[in-house]
Amino acid sequence: MTPRARPVVLFCLLSGLLAAACGQRGPSAAGGGRTPTIAVIPKGMTHEFWKAIHAGAARAGKELGVEILWKGPQKEDDRAQQITVVEDVINRGVAGIVLAPLDDQALVRPVQDAMRDGIPVVIMDSGLKGRDYVSYVATDNYQGGVLGAKHLGDLLGGRGKILLIRYLEGSESTTQRERGFLDALTKSFSGIDVLVRDQYAGATTETAYQLAENLLGRFPDVQGIFCPNESSTFGTLRALQESRLAGKVKFVGFDSSPKLVQALRDGHIHGLVLQNPVKIGYLGVVQVVRHLRGEKVPDRVDTGVTIATSANMETPEIKALLSPDLSILD
């Protein structure tokens, strides 16, 4: 099938879908015919965040009557494997792709290849340079960093020594969070001294733990820490607990998992900036299907960001974000 012919055929296959993107009623199921396949490609396959993305994508697939192909690299620093996954699903002739790019530059060419081959791509979670894609569905990551800075600054009364433990070079989402965090500190908390701002935790909880352990040894008088994602937050939590500093050092992290939620409850974490990964996965699939149906889709979909603390973690809204329903994956 030629690249020009593919969108026409897919439009016909999907023309029976009765969908509303994000209103009171969800998208309806598809009609008959061959079931289109949407490839959903995360940055990795292990973190709780990606499981929640998968749950959202699966829910959208069920409601829209499309098949979800969930496939990604095992590790969040394996750019080459993610590129290979994108190339593989292009060769399979999927109807569309929803991609969380590991690197904002390295994935540009594969996305361009998909679009040129008539396969629409929706970017989710983390941005991509250029504009060769259909839509971008994500948290306002800069604002997430701002929320983290304001909460940590307030916890410290506007004064103190802190560490910023970055995530991974090339990750657009966490870079935006780190930038928002530092900008907010500069603007509102001049009495806070950032002792470290250029150290990267790496893609795993183990490398994050090793970095945090080293930094806690170098800066025993640190009073606060901010981490921009799940793995850096968990690795740092472990280092704080093993050094008996958990609860003493004000600690604000990002994203959730059962162990991070328990640490918030125990007072070892003082705030978790929360995204809505189920919504990200869900709307990523919705946007690509709407595009295939010939509908106009927004360039940018903001899925929201908030912060969980010990004071609000039992409210229904926050509980749903801290412990999302993943039962559709069972």
Place the predicted regions along the sequence by residue.
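Bacterial N-terminal signal peptides that target proteins for export
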Residues: M1-F11
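Bacterial N-terminal signal peptides
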Residues: V9-A20
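A residue-level marker of the well-folded mature domains of exported/periplasmic proteins
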Residues: C22-D330
